[in-house]
């Protein structure tokens, strides 16, 4: 090794020891001919001092981020010169020998200053030298190790599934890879290991996991990455409770890394309850504001706006003091979400109701409204009226905005909840309207994916009454973020074919695209289920950062662009020719025997 000690490991107990350190010049200060350098390596920072001799002469040319090796004696700093903000603040190293391992060009940004994200990603190798980004990547490694330890204890088998497979045009868009040896044909990068892990269960592996790289060619959305990571788990001969029990053990081990003890069992909430109370299937439970249903309260109203299928309200504590400009801004906020506006009533300090809606209410409605919704003097009541789904979604979003504006969220709190009993199917129009890519060609598509089992009570009726069928699925939510989701899978061919039929996938198409899975189900496929955790989001939460880009070593920026390597980039004419990217595939008689990968798992 070029060094004897790590810079961040030195303490007063090592005084008078001769040590050799390596690292980068973080800061340089000259004081009357004495040069002080903050030397940084992965472990931390030590102050090194050049007082006299050849080493001190050399030190005059040191600049920020020079890579150096120093040898010297550990000394206790003089009284009054200690820096108790860092672990090494009681000592310094009196340097006797200096070797410059490599110089540094002028920096595009100072590492101890704020920098724009584009510059940080373009020079990510410099950004990673900073304490925050470096800590996030090291934390991610600990997260991986903690999960592996739990799963190894339970005798899970880590299996690598293929990353070159076949495209599924009905799923989310795939990244395609030309097959040079079969011009005109393409592999697809997997959106998840879903079907392969199910085949592992058929193969008798019984307990599988993988820290899996997944790929989705999606339109740009904030804080999404085209390549991402999930902890993928599958188990045979289990029910929902078994998977949840293991998942809670994994999560507990992860949150212990940041000193938090998760109280288990984690509470469960049905999808219907989450939507009714919070307007979201991933509710943030760190604050207590809830939606209040008002359709019954306004059943005899003469106010046409409230003569709707659904009328609901959410209270903004202290919101009555908002200026008119802010109340108008709420209307624009609602319109950006596809609503016509956000009706409101202001509750005065004397209990009287104000605002444009109040004058349209009857005396009886005005007298009972505050009590019905739980509003106090000084509060603002926001309303949504229309279809149940869209109105609840608007109020749920307003609930989150209220919490942020009124500082209702404890930033140090952790609130976990399982959301269970979601619908098995949703109208295809709803899925496409929300930006999802619907699988199948009928009026119904899968909420999770096509391989999720119906709940036992829905097995006999899900194809005759798709709108009422419940999924044998479970999502884990932390602080309003869905950090994982899974389900008990279909393991019987007849049930899988019935699900495909509901989704408008014909028998012939199912055989062509998923025949290998259907064939496998015919050979004693065991009951099985699993879960996939969003590894980037979990690590971001643990690291206390807002964006998943902060916990990915080399992330993409907006639109999937990599500022560091300038990827994606055009390929040469020779590469196009060799790859066969422009070739038309030859017709194949056995095309129906080729099989696809599946949509992303939850």
Swiss-Prot record:
ATP binds at residues 216-218, 225, 482, 534-537. Its EC number is 6.1.1.23. Homodimer. The record marks 31, 80 as: Important for tRNA non-discrimination. Residues 590-602 have a biased composition (Low complexity). Residues 194-197 are annotated as: Aspartate. It is found in: Cytoplasm. Keywords: Aminoacyl-tRNA synthetase, ATP-binding, Cytoplasm, Ligase, Nucleotide-binding, Protein biosynthesis. Residues 559-602 are annotated as: Disordered. L-aspartate binds at residues 170, 216, 448, 489. Residues 575-589 have a biased composition (Basic and acidic residues). Aspartyl-tRNA synthetase with relaxed tRNA specificity since it is able to aspartylate not only its cognate tRNA(Asp) but also tRNA(Asn). Reaction proceeds in two steps: L-aspartate is first activated by ATP to form Asp-AMP and then transferred to the acceptor end of tRNA(Asp/Asn). One of its GO terms (cellular component) is cytoplasm. It is an enzyme of class 6 (ligase). Belongs to the class-II aminoacyl-tRNA synthetase family. Type 1 subfamily. One of its GO terms (molecular function) is aspartate-tRNA ligase activity. Its main location: cytoplasm. The keyword Transmembrane does not apply. Pfam families: GAD, tRNA-synt_2, tRNA_anti-codon. This is Aspartate--tRNA(Asp/Asn) ligase. One of its GO terms (biological process) is aspartyl-tRNA aminoacylation. The keyword Cell membrane does not apply.
């Amino acid at each position: 090794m070029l060094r004897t000690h790590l810079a961040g490991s030195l303490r007063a107990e090592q005084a008078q020891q001769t040590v050799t350190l390596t690292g980068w010049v973080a800061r340089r200060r000259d004081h009357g001919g004495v040069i002080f350098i903050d030397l940084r390596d992965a472990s931390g920072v030590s102050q090194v001092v050049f007082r006299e001799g050849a080493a001190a002469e050399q030190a005059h040319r040191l600049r920020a981020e020079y890579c150096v090796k120093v040898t010297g004696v550990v000394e206790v700093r003089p009284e009054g010169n200690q820096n108790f903000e860092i672990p090494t603040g009681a000592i310094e190293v009196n340097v006797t020998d200096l070797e410059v391992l490599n110089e540094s060009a002028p920096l595009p940004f100072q590492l101890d200053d704020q920098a724009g994200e584009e510059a940080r990603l373009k020079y990510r190798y410099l950004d990673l030298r900073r304490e925050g980004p470096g800590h996030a990547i090291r934390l991610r490694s600990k997260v991986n190790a903690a999960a592996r330890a739990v799963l190894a204890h339970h005798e899970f088998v880590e299996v690598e599934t293929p990353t070159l497979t076949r495209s599924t045009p009905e799923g989310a868009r795939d990244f395609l890879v030309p097959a040079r040896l079969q011009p005109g044909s393409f592999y697809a990068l997997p959106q998840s290991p879903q079907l392969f892990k199910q085949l592992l269960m058929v193969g008798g592996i019984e307990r599988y996991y993988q820290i899996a790289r997944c790929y989705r060619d999606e339109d740009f959305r904030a804080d999404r990455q085209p390549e991402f990571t999930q902890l993928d788990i599958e188990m045979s001969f289990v029910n929902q409770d078994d998977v949840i029990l293991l998942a809670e053990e994994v999560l507990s081990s992860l949150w212990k890394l940041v000193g938090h003890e998760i109280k288990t069992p984690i509470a469960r909430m049905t999808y219907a309850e989450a939507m009714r109370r919070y307007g979201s299937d991933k509710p943030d439970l760190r604050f207590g504001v809830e939606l209040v249903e008002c359709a019954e309260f306004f059943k005899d109203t003469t106010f046409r706006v409230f003569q709707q299928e659904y009328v609901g309200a959410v209270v903004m504590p202290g919101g009555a003091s908002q200026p008119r400009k802010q109340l108008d801004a709420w209307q624009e906020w609602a319109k950006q979400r596809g609503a016509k506006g956000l009706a409101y009533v202001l509750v005065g300090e004397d209990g009287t109701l104000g605002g444009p809606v109040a004058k349209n209410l009857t005396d009886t409605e005005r007298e009972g409204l505050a009590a019905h919704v739980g509003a106090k003097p000084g509060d603002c009541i926001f309303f949504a009226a229309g279809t149940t789904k869209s109105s609840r979604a608007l109020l749920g979003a307003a609930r989150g905005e209220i919490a942020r504006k009124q500082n209702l969220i404890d930033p140090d709190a952790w609130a976990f909840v399982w959301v269970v009993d979601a619908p098995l199917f949703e109208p295809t129009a709803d899925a496409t309207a929300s930006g999802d890519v619907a699988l199948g060609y009928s009026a119904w598509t899968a909420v999770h994916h096509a391989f999720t089992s119906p709940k036992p009570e829905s097995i006999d009726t899900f194809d005759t009454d798709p709108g009422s069928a419940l999924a044998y699925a479970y999502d884990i939510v932390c602080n309003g973020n869905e950090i994982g989701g899974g389900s008990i899978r279909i393991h019987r061919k007849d049930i899988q074919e019935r699900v495909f039929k509901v989704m408008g996938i014909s028998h012939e198409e199912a055989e062509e695209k998923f025949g290998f899975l259907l064939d496998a189900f015919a050979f004693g496929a065991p009951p099985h289920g699993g879960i996939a955790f969003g590894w980037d989001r979990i690590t971001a939460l643990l690291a206390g950062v807002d964006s998943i880009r902060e916990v990915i070593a080399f992330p993409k920026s907006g639109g999937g662009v990599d500022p560091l390597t300038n990827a994606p980039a055009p390929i040469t004419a020779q590469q196009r020719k060799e790859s066969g990217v422009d070739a038309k595939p030859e017709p194949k008689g056995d095309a129906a025997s080729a099989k696809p990968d599946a949509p992303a798992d939850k």
